[in-house]
């Protein structure tokens, strides 16, 4: 009889870990966003900048993969508790600020990217892919929140869409 309790205890610990797993994914995405932001901010442009585009592209791809992995984590999670929801809300606020800052840096650096001709179109493609992945991640996380918090969460993440739309519109001007 003692063994029959063990699977239930393991299941309970798995559900408790879901909030932590989503938070870990958000932390990873925030760190990748911050790293990319720093690399883009240090971009010099011109021929010197050509070599600097490789780390930008690698970090951008890493960020995209982290977002996709975060979506898988959120999709696999059970509904979050109220306490987990509060923690996710705090992490979301930090992530929104980081994404907005990064996208502002990307927009500000566009003239330097334009000098290299081929870089701005690649950045545009990356922005569109990251926006799509971010939308999926956001929807997956919001779906795991208790119903009464979902509309609030959608309001918290709305500035990300605005920032992406602005950055994408700026990069579309290249064509």
Question: What residues fall within each predicted segment?
Answer:
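Mature, structured extracellular domains of secreted fungal proteins
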Residues: 18-175
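Fungal secretory targeting signals
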Residues: 1-20
């Amino acid at each position: 009889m003692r063994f029959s309790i063990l699977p239930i205890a393991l299941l309970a610990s798995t559900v408790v870990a879901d909030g932590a797993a989503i938070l870990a994914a958000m932390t990873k995405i925030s760190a990748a966003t911050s790293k990319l932001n720093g690399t883009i901010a240090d971009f010099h442009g011109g021929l010197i900048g050509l070599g600097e585009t490789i780390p930008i592209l690698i970090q951008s791809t890493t960020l995209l993969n982290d977002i996709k992995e975060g979506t898988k984590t959120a999709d696999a999670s059970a509904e979050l508790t109220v306490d987990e929801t509060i923690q996710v809300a705090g992490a979301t606020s930090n992530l929104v600020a980081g994404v907005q800052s990064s996208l502002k840096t990307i927009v500000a650096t566009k003239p330097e990217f334009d000098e290299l001709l081929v870089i701005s179109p690649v950045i545009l493609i990356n922005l569109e892919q990251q926006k799509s992945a971010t939308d999926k991640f956001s929807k997956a996380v919001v779906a795991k929140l208790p119903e009464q918090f979902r509309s609030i969460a959608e309001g918290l993440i709305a500035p990300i869409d605005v920032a992406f739309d602005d950055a994408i519109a700026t990069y579309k001007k290249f064509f």
